């Protein structure tokens, strides 16, 4: 095979059909090789070379144009280079000329920075130590609102800061100047606030009826007044920093409320309520208890309303006042704030209580005068004590209203009047019992019960203790309150009982029965109140036991005399035990036998139940049974002692067993039965 052909064939076979170059070549060929004719195939090579030549010519044309552009760019670059050289030369020249200017600019820049720092410092200083125009305006504008109090607080902050600076830096002169300006602002502001507060107190607190509801509901009447009411506690709170002005405001409140309370009390006494409802209190002047109760009830209601009213007004006040020295107010506040150990020796009082105490001082005189008039009408002991109980009740209620905030003046007034009533009460008791003792009534020998005077005194005691028991006195204080009032009264009744008994000239046994009946009546009254009458019950029990011993001894002696062995027992009791009883006069065997027979007959006739007329007169059934039993026991013991003496061989009685019909145990059984 022809080698040329072989190379061509081999070349064709070596062609990679998936070659990207082959694909691109064929794709380009399809753009101009549209007809597959013989002529086209023959001219294909020429056509391709022609196209290749055209492409090179186009490339050459483009390259010529690019070359021209590059040459132009080179020329432009040369121009720019020359311009830059000129600029650099100019800049170097300018730099040499303006170096001094730059130096000055740098110095000015540093100076500007320092000025800005000083400006910031001054702004901070003014912000810290100087009021803004708005704040200064809030201190002088007509209406006092929240901005006024904010400025006051700001003044206090500046003042405190100045005081700190006086201790911590060397700029004392400007600090003093600022402090002087701030103090002047403060003084003017507080004086203005004081005047405003004083006027508001006069306008808002002069109301006819001191009821807090009307005070709180002022917004229904007028919106402006509501705002003033809301600002009043804030104003008083701010004035705490000026103790003297604050005290004057408290005095102003007290004065306004004093007028209102005084007028209200006199109106309630003389005219009553609107349209006569409720009726005037003095319409019940004929009934001391009702009269006093109505007056105290009005004061109590008024105190409750006033306490709520003043508590609202002073709700933001936190300081306390020294009650012992009201003049030195600054010292009071300073001591209170320091809260040092010396404060334990001072008597501090809440401002609320101070205002209430001053306000209610006006009721002291009219109330005292009317109670003195009641006492001058000489009411009974019961009425007087009920008045005392009413005063004690409302005194304790007054202390409950003030919640232990301090000494309530109303309670003190009631306590003082109560002391006067107690003096009258004790005088009445003394006069009453002195009158009874001057002409004592003697007991009836038939029943030996308490006389009418003693019964009346015991009934009074019962009513008095019942009144005392219904009081508000705490259980742990009742005995302490009871003793000084009632112990003397009970002792007076006992003394009257003793005086009546001794004046009656009754036998000792009858006097003992009478005393027991009287004392047991008193004891029966006290036994209902054992929680606080224990001391008196113990005293009465001891006295009753003493009189019971007398009664039992006398009744036993009387019965033994009636039964015939009384004389024998007397001889037996006083014998000297040196000689036999049988040799003593009236103690021979025959006399003993006769006495024993008489004793047995009396006992047999009464069937063991002896008549004890004096014991029967005891009104208390328990004491009556106890006395009878005691008498029977003594009789049994007496019989036993006589029986033992007769059977004693030393006494030389013949056949002692034949003398006695009954043994002691039998006698005891008969008496017990």
Swiss-Prot record:
Kindly list the places in or outside the cell where this protein is found, as annotated in its UniProt entry.
Golgi apparatus membrane
Superkingdom is Eukaryota
Q: Can you cite a GO biological process for this protein?
A: protein transport
**Pfam families registered for this protein in UniProt:** COG6_C, COG6_N
Query: GO cellular component annotations, sorted alphabetically?
Result: Golgi membrane; Golgi transport complex
InterPro entries (alphabetical): COG6, COG6_C, COG6_N
Describe its function.
Answer: Required for normal Golgi function.
Relate the assembly described in the record.
Component of the conserved oligomeric Golgi complex which is composed of eight different subunits and is required for normal Golgi morphology and localization.
The similarity comment for this entry is: Belongs to the COG6 family.
Name of the protein: Conserved oligomeric Golgi complex subunit 6
Biological source species:
Dictyostelium discoideum (Social amoeba)
Q: Which gene encodes it?
A: cog6
């Amino acid at each position: 095979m022809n080698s040329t052909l072989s190379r061509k064939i081999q070349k064709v076979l070596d062609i990679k059909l998936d070659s990207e170059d082959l694909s691109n070549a064929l794709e380009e060929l399809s753009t101009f090789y549209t007809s597959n004719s013989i002529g086209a195939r023959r001219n294909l090579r020429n056509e391709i070379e022609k196209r290749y030549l055209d492409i090179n010519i186009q490339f050459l044309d483009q390259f010529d144009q690019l070359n021209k552009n590059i040459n132009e760019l080179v020329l432009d670059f040369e121009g720019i280079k020359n311009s830059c050289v000129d600029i650099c030369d100019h800049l170097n020249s300018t730099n040499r000329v303006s170096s001094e200017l730059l130096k000055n600019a740098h110095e000015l820049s540093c100076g500007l920075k320092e000025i800005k720092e000083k400006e910031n410092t001054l702004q901070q200083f003014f912000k810290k130590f100087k009021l803004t125009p708005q704040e200064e305006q809030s201190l002088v504008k007509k209406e006092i609102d929240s901005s006024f109090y904010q400025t006051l607080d700001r003044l206090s902050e500046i003042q405190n800061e100045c005081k700190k600076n006086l201790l911590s830096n060397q700029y004392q002169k400007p600090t003093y100047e600022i402090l002087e300006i701030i103090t002047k602002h403060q003084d003017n502001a507080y004086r203005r606030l004081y005047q405003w507060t004083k006027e508001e107190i006069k306008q808002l607190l002069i109301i006819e009826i001191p009821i807090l509801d009307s005070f709180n509901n002022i917004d229904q009447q007028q919106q402006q007044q509501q705002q003033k009411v809301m600002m009043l506690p804030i104003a008083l709170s701010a004035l705490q920093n000026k103790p003297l002005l604050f005290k004057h405001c408290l005095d102003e409140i007290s004065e306004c409320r004093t007028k209102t309370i005084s007028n209200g009390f006199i109106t309630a006494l003389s005219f009553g309520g609107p349209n006569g409802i409720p009726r005037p209190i003095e319409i019940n002047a004929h009934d001391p208890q009702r009269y006093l109760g109505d007056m105290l009830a009005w004061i109590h209601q008024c105190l409750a309303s006033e306490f709520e009213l003043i508590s609202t007004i002073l709700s933001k006040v936190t300081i306390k006042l020294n009650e012992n020295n009201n003049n030195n107010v600054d010292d009071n506040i300073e001591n209170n704030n320091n809260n040092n150990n010396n404060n334990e020796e001072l008597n501090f009082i809440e401002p609320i209580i101070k205002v209430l105490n001053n306000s209610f001082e006006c009721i002291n005189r009219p109330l005292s005068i009317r109670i003195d008039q009641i006492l001058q009408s000489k009411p009974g002991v019961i009425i007087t004590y009920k008045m005392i109980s009413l005063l004690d009740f409302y005194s304790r209620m007054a202390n409950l209203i003030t919640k232990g905030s301090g000494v309530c003046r109303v309670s003190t007034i009631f306590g003082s009047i109560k002391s006067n009533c107690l003096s009258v009460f004790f005088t009445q008791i003394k006069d009453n019992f002195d009158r009874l003792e001057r002409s004592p009534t003697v007991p009836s020998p038939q029943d030996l019960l308490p006389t009418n005077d003693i019964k009346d005194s015991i009934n009074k005691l019962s009513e008095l203790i019942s009144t005392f028991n219904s009081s508000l006195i705490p259980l742990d204080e009742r005995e302490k309150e009871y003793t000084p009032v009632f112990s003397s009264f009970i002792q007076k009744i006992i003394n009257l009982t003793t005086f009546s008994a001794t004046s009656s000239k009754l036998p000792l046994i009858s006097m003992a029965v009478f005393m027991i009946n009287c004392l047991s009546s008193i004891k029966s009254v006290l036994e209902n109140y054992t929680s606080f009458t224990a001391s008196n019950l113990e005293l009465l029990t001891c006295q009753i036991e003493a009189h019971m011993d007398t009664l039992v001894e006398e009744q036993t002696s009387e019965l033994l005399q009636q039964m015939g062995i009384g004389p024998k027992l007397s001889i037996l009791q006083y014998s000297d035990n040196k000689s036999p009883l049988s040799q003593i006069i009236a103690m021979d065997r025959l006399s003993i036998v006769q006495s024993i027979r008489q004793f047995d007959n009396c006992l047999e006739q009464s069937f063991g139940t002896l008549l004890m007329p004096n014991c029967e007169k005891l009104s208390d059934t328990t004491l009556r049974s106890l006395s009878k039993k005691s008498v029977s026991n003594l009789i049994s013991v007496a019989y036993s002692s006589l029986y033992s003496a007769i059977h004693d061989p030393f006494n030389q009685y013949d056949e002692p067993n034949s003398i006695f019909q009954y043994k002691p145990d039998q006698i005891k059984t008969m008496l017990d039965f």
